[in-house]
């Protein structure tokens, strides 16, 4: 009798394959888009900067003047006891949050909303920023880090600056174990052995005197879980000629 594949074990959802979400700090969203921000601004003080296992960038805890506490993505150069401001009348300063219509063209921005009040959707990874290309009364054009141009509502909010944690990819992992721990923190699947390198008891592509699948790698979408490996329900395989 063969062994269960890794996809079968992960699909069962045992603790070994679940995301350790109980260690995550909080959902990072802007405060509610209320009259304070639409008509003026609200100030807050950075009380702490912490690491969140759920994301690549550090997060800052902010206590606003109305007593509300929120976690925000920390921009570069922010420090504890710094003051930030959110709202239509906030100054153009790193860490402040304003509607796109109030931000000058060419300003680096991050944590951009897709629709007004959704809390932030784009440009949230460490070291990233977007550029505000142009805007008019009906739409604002933002260039994302990928080079894609995004046409957004001018009332969508964004933060001024660059997300902290830049240069993260420049530091090598050095050991496979370090990368394993990084993947484990987010519940990702770490690198595993290829099926053709396994024994026949471990994988449908295993066994034989040399490494080869030994059978067609295209399988039906209705195949049972133990056989659903390779090109699943593929319309075509190989190079397109």
From Swiss-Prot:
Q: One MF term in GO for this entry?
A: structural constituent of ribosome
Name a single GO biological process.
cytoplasmic translation
| UniProt-annotated stretches for the region Disordered | 201-241
Q: Name one GO cellular component term.
A: cytosolic large ribosomal subunit
| Gene3D superfamilies (UniProt xref) | 2.30.30.30, Nucleic acid-binding proteins (2.40.50.140), Ribosomal protein L2, domain 3 (4.10.950.10)
Task: Identify the keywords attached in UniProt to this record, alphabetized.
Answer: Ribonucleoprotein, Ribosomal protein, RNA-binding, rRNA-binding
The Swiss-Prot or TrEMBL record describes its family as follows: Belongs to the universal ribosomal protein uL2 family.
Q: How does it assemble?
A: Part of the 50S ribosomal subunit. Forms a bridge to the 30S subunit in the 70S ribosome.
Q: Which HAMAP family match?
A: Ribosomal_uL2_A
Purpose: One of the primary rRNA binding proteins. Required for association of the 30S and 50S subunits to form the 70S ribosome, for tRNA binding and peptide bond formation. It has been suggested to have peptidyltransferase activity; this is somewhat controversial. Makes several contacts with the 16S rRNA in the 70S ribosome.
Protein name per its UniProtKB record? Large ribosomal subunit protein uL2
Q: Which organism is it from?
A: Methanobrevibacter smithii (strain ATCC 35061 / DSM 861 / OCM 144 / PS)
């Amino acid at each position: 009798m063969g062994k269960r594949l890794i996809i079968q074990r992960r699909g069962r959802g045992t603790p070994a394959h679940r995301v350790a979400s109980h260690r995550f700090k909080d959902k990072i969203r802007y405060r509610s888009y209320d009259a304070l921000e639409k008509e003026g601004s609200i100030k807050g003080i950075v009380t702490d900067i912490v690491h969140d296992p759920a994301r690549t960038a550090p997060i800052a805890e902010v206590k606003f003047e109305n007593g509300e506490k929120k976690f925000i993505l920390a921009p570069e150069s922010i420090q504890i006891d710094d003051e930030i401001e959110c709202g239509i009348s906030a100054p153009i300063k790193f860490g402040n949050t304003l509607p796109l219509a109030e931000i000058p063209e060419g300003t680096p921005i991050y944590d951009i909303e897709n629709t007004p009040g959704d809390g932030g959707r784009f440009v949230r990874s460490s070291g990233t920023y977007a550029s505000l290309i142009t805007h008019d009364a009906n739409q604002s054009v933002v260039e994302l880090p990928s080079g894609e141009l995004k046409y957004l509502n001018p009332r969508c909010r964004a933060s001024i600056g660059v997300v902290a944690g830049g240069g993260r990819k420049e530091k090598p992992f050095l050991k496979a174990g370090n990368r394993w721990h990084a993947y484990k923190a987010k519940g990702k699947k770490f690198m595993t052995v290829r099926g053709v390198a396994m024994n026949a008891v471990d994988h449908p592509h295993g066994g034989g005197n040399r490494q080869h699948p030994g059978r067609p790698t295209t399988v039906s979408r209705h195949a049972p879980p133990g056989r659903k490996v390779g090109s699943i329900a593929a319309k075509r395989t190989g190079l397109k000629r």
